[in-house]
Each structure stands twice: as structure tokens, then as C-alpha cells.
Design a protein with these regions (language model features):
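Hinge/beta->alpha junction and helix N-cap segments in small-molecule ligand-binding domains
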Residues: 48-58, 76-85, 139-149, 165-186, ...
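Alpha-helical recognition/docking segments in bacterial nutrient-uptake
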Residues: 39-152, 156
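A short helix->loop->beta-strand "cap" motif at the edges of active sites that frequently abuts
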Residues: 119-124, 190, 250-253
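Flexible loop/turn connectors
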Residues: 215-310
Length: 310
């Protein structure tokens, strides 16, 4: 097996002889058997619970491609009401993954204390959200910097009655965007930020939250700019504001998002948004998993993408 193991103690001449013989016999090493001996499976579990968000798929594509380039197989685990974080973590523990990536999921610290989890649980990483759990580092966009840039941009545009649409409560807390948005408006002298609540991250949820707010609020009292926690909420809110309430965007209501999904760039929306440093975040987390970089929390800067919606 040493001939098939990078860095193993074997001369190059001997390694080549073994590889040539293996090729002639159409032999390849049994990775399952090797994992029993080395306790390394070359498999990484990725937990996802927000499949309605179109930002997820391109990030997953980039993440899996980068992991595969390192010889790591990705196992996708769908977190939902029938298969929660505890079940997923137990499943990951039983399968002896080399690492677990929590992508777009938020869970409670006490989950890690579940007595059914083994003592040698694989290392966990949070991608694209904050983590306050000791030993579970987050690799994320710098939300404070992002919201500072966004509020500066909106303030310079003349907006003074801001609103913010949140998504699912547990995930919103992990994002921290609403908190920073309100803080930076206060620094501008704007004390109140109207909050709209969507119960999930989808265009329908964004439309429902916008409909409830616009129906209950007369035009003179409405916000003049609405930031949505992500782009798909913003697109749903824009559709409803324009088609059901006759709002002109941005003249009557400016709308901004976060993520820079492809649909938001189309002429139909022209959505002002913020792009996360996806490549850099993925590269960082893979380097930590492979041991090429120290394991630690990392925040990285993204960039503002101004368009016609604000």
C-alpha cells in the first residue's frame, strides 16, 4: 500500500514498479480497507438546510470541485424537519468523515453535547455564517465591513427611512447582517430601522413579507429603502412591490440584497447587492481541512455591487 500513499517511505523506482504492475493487473487500492487501517476516509460531509436559495448551488459546485481536487469526496446531507442537526451529526460520527462543513446552517451549542455523539467526532467548520461555538471556526464574509459599505452607499444616495427584511430567525442570528445594518444607520443619525420578517429564504417568503408590510403601511409612511438579508428575498419583495402595489423601483422603494446571484443582475431586476468572497472562503476552508493552514476563524472582505435598484 505504500506505493499508493503519497509521501510514504518507498523509493521512486520501487513505487514505479508497483504502479506498473498494478496497471497491468487493472488493480486499484480499496479505499474502505485503507480507511480501516489509517482512520482516514477522504470524505467530507456538507450539511445544507436552505435549498430554496439559488446562491447555494454555485457555491456547492465550487466547494465540491475544490475538495475533489484534493482527493476528498463530498457527501451532501440535507438538514430538514425530518432530519435535524442531531441526527445528521450522529450520522456523520458513525460514518467517520474526516471533516464536517456546516454550509448555511445554524445550530445550538448544546447539540454538540448530545450523549449519542462519540468522543472522536470529526472537526467541524462553518462556511458563510458566523459561529460562536468554541472549537467550531467560521470562515465567512466580513459582515460588519459589508454592511458598513452598504449603509454608506445608501446614505450617500439620500435614503433616510431604512427597512430590513430578515429570513429564518435561527439563521438570521448567525448572519449578523440585521444587527450591523441597524448599528451603521444609528451612526448616521437614523435611530429606527423597520423590520420585516420572512419565515424562510425564498422568493415567495420575500413576496409575502413585502405584501404584509405594504398592505398595512400607507405610502407616505413606508421605508424608502429595503435591504433584504439575501438576494432571493429581495427579488420576491421587488416583484410584489411593483406588480401588486405599483411601486417604482427605486423611485418609490429602493431594494438591495446580499449574495449577488445571477438572476439579480438581469435587466428585470438590476439588483444592488453585495458579493461574498466565495472563492477565497472555500480555498481557506479546504486548506484547513487538508492541514495546509491553521484552523481558526476567518473573515474575508467582499465587495459592493451597485445597480439600478438603489
Amino acid at each position: 500500500m505504500r506505493a499508493f500513499t503519497p509521501g510514504a517511505s518507498i523509493t521512486e523506482a520501487s513505487r514505479q514498479k508497483v504502479l506498473q504492475a498494478a496497471e497491468a493487473l487493472n488493480y486499484s487500492p480499496n479505499l474502505l480497507a485503507r480507511s480501516l487501517a489509517t482512520n482516514v476516509t477522504h470524505q467530507v460531509a456538507v450539511f445544507v438546510d436552505d435549498f430554496a436559495n439559488p446562491h447555494k448551488l454555485p457555491v456547492l459546485e465550487m466547494l465540491t470541485e475544490r475538495l475533489q481536487a484534493e482527493g476528498l469526496l463530498t457527501v451532501l446531507i440535507n438538514i430538514n424537519r425530518h432530519f435535524d442537526h442531531v441526527h445528521a451529526l450522529i450520522n456523520a460520527d458513525q460514518r467517520q468523515f474526516d471533516a464536517v462543513i456546516l454550509f448555511g446552517t445554524a445550530f445550538r451549542e448544546e447539540t454538540l453535547g448530545d450523549r449519542r455523539l462519540g468522543p472522536d467526532f470529526p472537526p467541524m467548520f462553518v462556511l458563510a455564517r458566523d459561529s460562536q461555538i468554541p472549537g467550531v471556526p467560521a470562515i465567512a464574509c466580513n459582515a460588519e465591513l459589508a454592511l458598513s459599505q452598504m449603509v454608506d452607499y445608501l446614505f450617500d444616495k439620500g435614503y433616510r427611512r431604512p427597512g430590513f427584511m430578515t429570513g429564518a430567525r435561527t439563521l438570521s442570528t448567525a448572519l449578523g447582517r440585521r444587527h450591523h445594518y441597524a448599528n451603521f444607520w444609528r451612526r448616521k443619525g437614523v435611530e429606527s430601522v423597520i423590520e420585516l420578517n420572512a419565515d424562510r429564504y425564498s422568493a415567495d417568503a420575500g413576496a409575502e413579507a413585502a405584501r404584509a408590510y405594504l398592505s398595512a403601511t400607507p405610502p407616505p409612511s413606508r421605508v424608502d429603502v429595503l435591504m433584504c438579508e439575501n438576494d432571493i428575498l429581495a427579488l420576491g419583495a421587488m416583484d410584489t412591490a411593483r406588480s401588486e402595489f405599483g411601486c417604482r423601483v427605486p423611485q418609490d422603494l429602493a431594494v438591495v440584497g446580499f449574495d449577488n446571484i445571477e438572476l439579480g443582475a438581469t435587466p428585470t431586476y438590476g439588483l444592488t447587492t453585495y458579493e461574498q468572497p466565495t472563492y477565497e472562503m472555500i480555498n481557506t476552508i479546504v486548506e484547513m481541512i487538508t492541514g495546509a493552514r491553521a484552523v481558526e476563524a476567518v473573515t474575508l472582505p467582499g465587495h459592493l455591487v451597485p445597480r439600478l435598484s438603489a
